[in-house]
């Protein structure tokens, strides 16, 4: 139960109280529960969409997106903004890229990236609302957080210290493989071709991280999640 609470506290803005400072082993095990947190997000969004039935589609989509951002506390959007600034401002240099990621200030590239991602997600949700969204709302949050588990399983963590290193070093790898397999089968049954799109986007983004940094950071993991969620809702809206 503790690893799930750790995952929920880290990935969401929901009020979660831990009994104390968790051990590194429990922090590593919390990664196994990231997909479950994603599923919980999806269920809450599905419920919100049901309660908003009858609302004009643009407002329905805007409120859904607002709930989505509030649930995560904009944590991963922050990672996306930092990664966007660093990727373009780093000019291909590893150390410069990592240094820019640590800068708390957001440049114009970060702002433009966030606006485009949120605009595209809003438009995709608008289309899905008009089509009658249902169980498909489970997919994007679930795939996004499952991808974080997959990233830490198969990609070195390049920034020493902190939560990310504890996650990477203490992740139970065999159990993680089984969790990924079960999630993949569930998502394939629910989403079909859009899951293959998500896998392709994951592989491409991981390749970019590995080529530039030699691995992943917390910021790039957050960027991965946001871009995968966007890819999934766009794929669903386009009828893939």
Swiss-Prot record:
Main location: membrane
Pathway(s) this gene product operates in, as recorded in its UniProt entry: Cofactor biosynthesis; adenosylcobalamin biosynthesis; adenosylcobalamin from cob(II)yrinate a,c-diamide: step 7/7
EC id: 2.7.8.26
Protein's cellular compartments: Cell inner membrane
Keyword Cell inner membrane belongs to the record: yes
Transmembrane segments: 31-51, 57-77, 109-129, 133-153, 185-205
Biological process terms in GO annotation: cobalamin biosynthetic process
InterPro entries, sorted: CobS
GO MF, one annotated term: cobalamin 5'-phosphate synthase activity
Catalytic reaction annotation: alpha-ribazole + adenosylcob(III)inamide-GDP = adenosylcob(III)alamin + GMP + H(+); alpha-ribazole 5'-phosphate + adenosylcob(III)inamide-GDP = adenosylcob(III)alamin 5'-phosphate + GMP + H(+)
Cofactor: Mg(2+)
Membrane topology: Multi-pass membrane protein
One annotated Gene Ontology cellular component of this protein: plasma membrane
Record Pfam families: CobS
Enzyme class at the top of the EC tree: transferase
Keywords: Cell inner membrane, Cell membrane, Cobalamin biosynthesis, Magnesium, Membrane, Transferase, Transmembrane, Transmembrane helix
Similarity comment text for this entry: Belongs to the CobS family.
HAMAP family tied to this protein: CobS
Described purpose of this protein according to its UniProt entry: Joins adenosylcobinamide-GDP and alpha-ribazole to generate adenosylcobalamin (Ado-cobalamin). Also synthesizes adenosylcobalamin 5'-phosphate from adenosylcobinamide-GDP and alpha-ribazole 5'-phosphate.
Record-given protein name: Adenosylcobinamide-GDP ribazoletransferase
GN (gene name): cobS
């Amino acid at each position: 139960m503790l690893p799930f609470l750790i995952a929920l506290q880290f990935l969401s803005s929901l009020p979660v109280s831990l009994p104390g400072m968790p051990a590194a082993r429990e922090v590593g095990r919390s990664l196994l529960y990231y997909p479950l947190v994603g599923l919980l997000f999806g269920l809450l969004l599905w419920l919100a969409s049901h309660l908003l039935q009858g609302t004009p589609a643009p407002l329905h989509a805007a409120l859904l997106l607002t709930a989505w951002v509030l649930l995560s506390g904009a944590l991963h959007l922050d990672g996306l903004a930092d990664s966007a600034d660093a990727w373009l401002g780093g000019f291909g240099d590893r150390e410069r890229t990592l240094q820019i990621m640590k800068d708390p200030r957001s440049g114009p590239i970060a702002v433009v990236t966030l606006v485009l991602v949120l605009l595209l997600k809003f438009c995709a949700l608008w289309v899905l609302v008009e089509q009658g969204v249902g169980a498909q709302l489970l997919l994007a949050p679930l795939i996004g957080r499952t991808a974080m588990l997959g990233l830490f399983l198969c990609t070195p963590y390049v920034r020493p210290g902190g939560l990310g290193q504890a996650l990477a070093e203490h992740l139970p790898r065999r159990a993680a493989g089984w969790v990924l397999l079960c999630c993949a089968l569930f998502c394939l049954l629910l989403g079909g071709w859009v899951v293959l799109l998500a896998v392709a986007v994951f592989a491409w983004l991981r390749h970019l991280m590995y080529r530039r940094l030699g691995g992943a950071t917390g910021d790039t993991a957050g960027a991965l999640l946001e871009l995968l969620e966007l890819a999934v809702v766009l794929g669903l809206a386009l009828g893939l």
